[in-house]
Amino acid sequence: MATENNWSFEQTDIAERLATVDDAALDVLQFGIIGFDEQTIVQRYNTFESQLAGLNKSRVLGHPFFTSVAPCMNNFLVAQRFEDALATGDTLDVTLDYVLTLRMKPVKVKLRLLAGSARALSYVLILRPLPS
């Protein structure tokens, strides 16, 4: 799925690109991007995700991702993978099918989990079906 400025959910260098662009560049993309620090405090949240999740940026930025923003991801499939990568210093780049359930009817999505010891932020990318 190609998007603005040759970004795609699947591209291999997306973690490196995320580290080098400003938030305005993320806001034109057609998939969700949530970036958080080692304490899981959300630092980046793009417009696409805000609109489809129904959570405005002020409700998300500066808040703990797994406990306040997305408790439906506070589980072994998602949160634990980030904890393990942080503990071991390993790079995390995994894509998985997932069902989002918080504040909405269940929605099938693809998640891409990105983390690495050399990166300031970890990311959850969310590929959703586009509204009709």
Predicted features and spans:
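Sensory/regulatory domains in signal-transduction proteins
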Residues: F31, F36-S132
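PAS-family sensory domains
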Residues: D23-A25
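Short, charged amphipathic alpha-helical "coupling" segments at sensory-output junctions
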Residues: A2-V21
